[in-house]
Structures are given as structure tokens and as C-alpha cells.
């Protein structure tokens, strides 16, 4: 039987209100647990490893699973981020790669190196479609996944929809492109907005 696990991104809990203090990490974890989410999604780059590691006791206290969206800015930076994910018992890791060669051919060895690094870990490692990252562009992504057949994706389609200014009804070509992305995806990122006064 299939199940759907839903994780709340910790960054999305930020209020960003100029006259209100931000809730503490503990308050956010408590709210996430109370709302019934499977777990929390954390978003570290290498310099943020210590502060991310410090959240492990809150995951344990509130019985929440962990997934990481990691931001490596070199091929070598992926390993310490995956080691952090292993320490935190992450269920899943999404790479939002800060290595962005202009030519697809130059991205192939980057993706392949990250896949080899991920082979040393037991959790799934996916590549997220995301603005300002390796998979910034729909056409670039389609070409790269064709050249690297083992790449599995986390689809954040909003970046492609906005980037391409897609309109409804979708053109047949756009539908086919999106179907290709979805067929290579094991995870999805999405946003829900609740209007607040």
C-alpha cells in the first residue's frame, strides 16, 4: 500500500514580520508535531552544519522524522552534508546544487560524482528542480537527466512554471516535458498559503 509522508519545511515557519519576534525552534517543532506532519525538512549548507546538528534533540523530543535539502557549492561539499543527514537519521536528502555549469556536458560529471558519493549512504538522495541551482531550467534538466539516467528528482515544479511563464491550458509540449520530470521524480515540493491579516 502506498503512503504519503508530508514534511514541513522549517524555513517556511518563519514569520518575517517586522514587529513580531520569530518563534523559537522549539515552538516551531512543537507546532509541526501538533499539526501531525511526518517530520521536518531542514535546509543546510556546509557552514550551517553545526546549527542544523543542534536541532537533533528537538527531532527526537517531538518524534519527528527528518529530511534535508542540502546546498553543496562544490562537488566535495556534498559528503559532509550527507554525513550530517546520516547523523540526523534523515529519511531522504534532496540536493539543491550550487555548482551550475552553463553547458550540460559539464554538469554530467558533477551529477555523476554526487551520485557516487551518495552510494556510501543508505537513504535516498534526489536532485531537486529549483531556481538558482544545477536544475534551474526545464530544458537543461531534461537534457541532464537524459545523459545521467540514474538521477532521480524531487520535483518543485513551481520554478519551471514561473520560469517558463506557463499558461493554462498547458500546451502539449509543456505537458510532455512535465510528464518526463514527474516520471523521474520520487518526491515533490509544494507550497500552501493561508491568508493572514
What label would you give each PLM region?
Residues 1-86, 90:
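N-terminal pre-domain/capping segments
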Residues 25, 52, 77-78, 104-107, ...:
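Aromatic/hydrophobic pocket-lining residues that form the small-molecule binding cavity
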Residues 120-196:
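Acidic/histidine-rich catalytic cores of soluble enzymes
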Residues 3-7, 38-41, 63-67, 91-94, ...:
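Structural preference for beta-strand elements that scaffold enzyme active sites
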Residues 9-16, 43-47, 69-73, 98-100, ...:
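Active-site beta-loop-alpha junctions enriched in small/polar residues
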Residues 77-126:
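Glycine/proline-rich, flexible active-site/cofactor-binding loop segments
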Amino acid at each position: 500500500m502506498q503512503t504519503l509522508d508530508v514534511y514541513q519545511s522549517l524555513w517556511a515557519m518563519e514569520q518575517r514580520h517586522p514587529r513580531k519576534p520569530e518563534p523559537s525552534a522549539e515552538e516551531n517543532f512543537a507546532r509541526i508535531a501538533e499539526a501531525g506532519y511526518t517530520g521536518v525538512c531542514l535546509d543546510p549548507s556546509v557552514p550551517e552544519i553545526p546549527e542544523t546538528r543542534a536541532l537533533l534533540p528537538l527531532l527526537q523530543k517531538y518524534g519527528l522524522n527528518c529530511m534535508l535539502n542540502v546546498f553543496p557549492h562544490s562537488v566535495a561539499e556534498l559528503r559532509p552534508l550527507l554525513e550530517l543527514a546520516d547523523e540526523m537519521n534523515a529519511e531522504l536528502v534532496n540536493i539543491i546544487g550550487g555548482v551550475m555549469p552553463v553547458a550540460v556536458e559539464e554538469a554530467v560529471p558533477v551529477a555523476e560524482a554526487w551520485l557516487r558519493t551518495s552510494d556510501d549512504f543508505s537513504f535516498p538522495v534526489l536532485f531537486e528542480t529549483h531556481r538558482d541551482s544545477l536544475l534551474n531550467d526545464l530544458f537543461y534538466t531534461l537534457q541532464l537527466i537524459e545523459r545521467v539516467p540514474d538521477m532521480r528528482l524531487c520535483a518543485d515544479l513551481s520554478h519551471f512554471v514561473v520560469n517558463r511563464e506557463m499558461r493554462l491550458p498547458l500546451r502539449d509540449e509543456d505537458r510532455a516535458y512535465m510528464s518526463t520530470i514527474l516520471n523521474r521524480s520520487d518526491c515533490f515540493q509544494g507550497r500552501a498559503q493561508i491568508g493572514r491579516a
